[in-house]
Amino acid sequence: MKAISITLLVGAMAAAAACSSSSTSPSASIAGTYVLSSVNGESLPAIVTKTGDDTAVVVADTLALTANNTYTRHAVDTLRSEVSGVTLYSHVSSGTYARSGSSITLTDAVTDSSATGTIANNAITISSVENGFAVTGVFTKQ
């Protein structure tokens, strides 16, 4: 089975962000470092998909948002297979983000794909469908 990327944000998964205060006002800065704290309600490491003998697990995901509306994301996932054992995958992606009120849209620089999320109380929630599976990730500001 090909590796299942835990791409919570689109475009090799653009990343997410949160407010630097509990405010979601458009003027609140969201620049900073964010860490994926849960996937589908589970703390990391979290199983995202299980298909046959293969299990995709999110191990870690870090996101850096800059004040000039760019981001870099580094995700670490594993694919556990009865046939080939455990394979570790490290994904780095980058792009731009735009904020409108409590919404954020991230656009991958390579694929030009985008994802949207909701910002609230120093966290952003992104929901997507990855390889046919519903995935909801919450990133929290550090």
List the model feature ranges, each with a label.
Residues 14-18:
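C-terminal motif of bacterial Sec signal peptides marking the signal peptidase cleavage site
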Residues 20-142:
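Lipid interaction determinants
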Residues 1-8:
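Bacterial N-terminal signal peptides that target proteins for export
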